[in-house]
Curated annotation (Swiss-Prot):
Heme b b562 binds at residues 83, 182. Binds 2 heme b groups non-covalently. Pfam families: Cytochrom_B_C, Cytochrome_B. This is Cytochrome b.
Length: 379
């Protein structure tokens, strides 16, 4: 008799995705981040649901309701900090997942990669509107600064900003709609993640060598499920250590001051995971130019498959490309550091150089290096 998991219409879908899925035998721990992102998403939706039960999206009570969650709700403090630090873990996994895709040429799966880029934009939007909800100083001024960037759009900019605000400044209407967006977006992310998986399972996973591995596949369960569980345990361990020992390590102290439109914080900056893009935005002394650079810094990922010039898919056997990849990682870390610094000498010039290098690496240096490596392989 055939097992029910192979015949039942619903269980068959789950079985084909998580049990009998043919998987390359040589995929490393860098392939764990996809499942970790799924875990992060589920944790964020659950903690967010419980927070939404006690939160009030109103300018007069939002800050107090967050305080109430932390002080009066049973285990409210841990739910709140799991949600805040869970976002940081989400982005750590997200950037590792993207880095893996870049290094091993996973972007050759065009549909999967493009859905991934859309997912990145959606997650960034969710994190941004979520950061506004506690209605602290950084929430308010962050929302004001970032939404104001849209006013750089010629002709319709100002109208567009006021339309998003629901008034002439960031106020009650803005907070209410941002809460609505923050509630709905994770479910859109969930739907997109399923589409991401559907496209991935059309082709099967890539592997470190970048060579097709159809002749050497193993079932996903138990070999990779046990490996994913180990990764999940490590993720939960790190998240709990962060939440219980240093819950405010990655936050901004300014956000413990209620929002005040009459007092601007000394340094307005986003959460750490947006600092690299913020540094690129600030490095161009022109509003429209900065906004375009900010948009392109993320959108450039969609063009990566077209910029692939190598005869080999993975960077595993391409030392020069490997070197440039790690230069790119170092450059992004530099931009992240610069994004958190004030706009003054020498930070400005370092930020500008790092921004130029970022685009230069992706658009010129890496494709040209790949062509040189192709030539070397023929010698």
């Amino acid at each position: 008799m055939t097992n029910i998991r192979k015949t039942h219409p619903l269980m068959k879908i789950v079985n084909d995705a998580f049990v009998d899925l043919p998987t390359p035998s040589n995929i490393s721990s860098w392939w764990n981040f996809g499942s970790l992102l799924g875990l992060c998403l589920i944790m964020q939706i659950l903690t967010g649901l419980f927070l939404a039960m006690h939160y009030t999206p109103d300018t007069t009570t939002a800050f107090s309701s967050v305080t109430h969650i932390c002080r009066d709700v049973n285990y409210g403090w841990i739910i709140r900090y799991l949600h805040a630090n869970g976002a940081s873990m989400f982005f750590i996994c997200l950037y590792a997942h993207m880095g893996r895709g870049l290094y091993y040429g996973s972007y050759a799966f065009r549909e999967t990669w493009n859905i991934g880029v859309i997912l990145l934009f959606t997650v960034m939007a969710t994190a941004f509107v979520g950061y506004v909800l506690p209605w602290g100083q950084m929430s308010f001024w962050g929302a004001t600064v970032i939404t104001n960037l849209l006013s750089a759009i010629p002709y319709i900019g100002t109208t567009l900003v006021e339309w998003i605000w629901g008034g002439f400044s960031v106020d009650k209407a803005t907070l209410t709609r941002f809460f609505a967006f923050h509630f709905i977006l994770p479910f859109i992310i969930l739907a997109l993640a399923i589409v991401h998986l559907i496209f991935l399972h059309e082709t099967g996973s890539n592997n470190p060598t970048g060579i097709p591995s159809d002749m050497d596949k193993i079932p996903f369960h138990p070999y990779h499920t046990i490996k994913d569980i180990l990764g999940a345990l490590l993720l939960i361990l790190i998240l709990l250590m962060l939440t219980l020992f240093a819950p405010d390590l990655l936050g901004d102290p300014d956000n413990y001051t209620p929002a005040n439109p009459l007092s601007t914080p000394a340094h307005i900056k986003p959460e750490w995971y947006f600092l690299f893009a913020y540094a690129i935005l600030r490095s161009i002394p022109n509003k429209l130019g900065g906004v375009l650079a900010l948009l392109l810094s993320i959108l450039i990922l969609a063009f990566i498959p077209m910029l692939h010039t190598s005869n080999q898919r993975s960077m595993m056997f391409r030392p020069f490309s490997q070197f440039l990849f790690w230069v790119l990682v170092a450059d992004l870390l530099t931009l992240t550091w610069i994004g958190g610094q004030p706009v003054e000498h020498p930070y400005m010039i370092v930020g500008q150089l790092a921004s130029i290098l970022y685009f230069l690496l992706i658009l010129v240096l890496m494709p040209v290096t790949s062509l040189i490596e192709n030539k070397l392989m023929k010698w």
